[in-house]
């Protein structure tokens, strides 16, 4: 298996698909990387030469991926929470951040339903 940015990418798949196994690289970014490294997008990882793999690694090193990207995202969220912005407060409370309604749904963010016992009628 070839390692790019600390991730073992599958050998049998095309290079464009294999690059998407790296956190922070999607299909469009993978296409840009392959084009920048002058490698055919249809080439399978097992058929790549060491030179081509090296060029791809160099290009990927220019992107923020894996641990660096996760760390930056966490720091951004912590910063929002520290300055007590609206978004930071929503993160702190575990509620949707992007303006979604919460009266009915938002169960993914809020967690399982906490039932309250009804008064006896």
Swiss-Prot record:
One of its GO terms (cellular component) is small ribosomal subunit. Pfam families: Ribosomal_S13 (PF00416). InterPro entries: Rbsml_uS13_C, Ribosomal_uS13, Ribosomal_uS13-like_H2TH, Ribosomal_uS13_bac-type, Ribosomal_uS13_CS. Residues 91-121 are annotated as: Disordered. GO terms for molecular function: rRNA binding; structural constituent of ribosome; tRNA binding. One of its GO terms (biological process) is translation. Part of the 30S ribosomal subunit. Forms a loose heterodimer with protein S19. Forms two bridges to the 50S subunit in the 70S ribosome. Belongs to the universal ribosomal protein uS13 family. This is Small ribosomal subunit protein uS13. The lineage of its organism: Bacteria, Bacillati, Bacillota, Bacilli, Bacillales. The gene is rpsM.
């Amino acid at each position: 298996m070839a390692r790019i940015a600390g991730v073992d990418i599958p050998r049998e798949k095309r290079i464009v698909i294999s690059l998407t196994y790296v956190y922070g690289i999607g299909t469009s970014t993978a296409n840009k990387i392959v084009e920048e490294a002058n490698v055919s997008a249809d080439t399978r990882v097992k058929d790549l030469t060491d030179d081509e793999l090296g060029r791809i690694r160099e290009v990927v090193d220019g992107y923020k991926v894996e641990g660096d990207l996760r760390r930056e995202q966490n720091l951004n969220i912590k910063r929002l929470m520290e300055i007590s912005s609206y978004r930071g407060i929503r993160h702190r409370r575990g509620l949707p951040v992007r303006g979604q309604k919460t009266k009915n749904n938002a169960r993914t963010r809020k967690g399982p339903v906490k039932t309250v016992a009804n008064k006896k009628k």
